[in-house]
Amino acid sequence: MSRYRGPRFKKIRRLGALPGLTSKRPRSGSDLRNQSRFGKRSQYRIRLEEKQKLRFHYGLTERQLLRYVRIAGKAKGSTGQVLLQLLEMRLDNTLFRLGMASTIPGARQLVNHRHILVNSRIVDIPSYRCKPRDIITTRDEQRSRTLIQNHIDSSPHEELPKHLTLHSFQYKGLVNQIIDSKSIGLKINELLVVEYYSRQT
């Protein structure tokens, strides 16, 4: 299944706020209206919607998300928590959380077009897993810096998660540590996502 490129507002109206996909928010009460329109949701549908929420927020294909679930399942600790850490530490999501891109698809485009350096080397793989002490900067070219500055200026000035630091005048972000569960950028029940995949196998 390919990455979603359709109308974004349609998705947030059905699944709720997806800040990685779009800064728009569904009107209050729209989720309740949808629930009454479609009737009582089955347990399968609840798990499916939670999985879709995760997939659309982080901009993943079905195959990519399944691969992350399998990696998380083999790691120590809670599969759901490890899954969220893996997704949050992706380079495209890290740029988004730093405010250097307005959405995760926008961050992915910056990476694909080779505007981003990690530890002074160009990284053009959005799924690159950021590690503690990674230094994320832009190329010295004026176009790269202008793109990043525009995003920083227009992004809502919310408090950064503790695992990140932004030096906006230097166009530089620092990864301080692995993200903790309290700083995840999406309201999600990750256990339902794990349950969804465990019942598919």
Swiss-Prot record:
What keywords would UniProt list here?
A: Chloroplast, Plastid, Ribonucleoprotein, Ribosomal protein, RNA-binding, rRNA-binding
Q: Name one GO molecular function term.
A: structural constituent of ribosome
Q: Which Gene3D superfamilies match?
A: Ribosomal Protein S4 Delta 41, Chain A, domain 1 (1.10.1050.10), RNA-binding S4 domain (3.10.290.10)
The record places domain S4 RNA-binding at 89-152
Instruction: Name any one Pfam family assigned in the record.
Output: Ribosomal_S4
The primary location reported for this protein is plastid
UniProt KW Glycosyltransferase keyword: no
Q: Which GO terms describe its cellular component?
A: chloroplast; small ribosomal subunit
Subcellular location field:
Plastid, Chloroplast
Q: Name one GO biological process term.
A: translation
Q: Which residues form a coiled coil?
A: none
The ranges of region (Disordered) come to: 16-37
UniProt xrefs under InterPro entries? Ribosomal_uS4, Ribosomal_uS4_bac-type, Ribosomal_uS4_CS, Ribosomal_uS4_N, S4_RNA-bd, S4_RNA-bd_sf
Asked if the record carries the keyword Oxidoreductase, the reply is no
Biological role: One of the primary rRNA binding proteins, it binds directly to 16S rRNA where it nucleates assembly of the body of the 30S subunit. With S5 and S12 plays an important role in translational accuracy.
What is said about its interaction partners and assembly?
Part of the 30S ribosomal subunit. Contacts protein S5. The interaction surface between S4 and S5 is involved in control of translational fidelity.
Q: Which family does it belong to?
A: Belongs to the universal ribosomal protein uS4 family.
The protein's name: Small ribosomal subunit protein uS4c
What lineage is on file?
Eukaryota, Viridiplantae, Streptophyta, Embryophyta, Tracheophyta
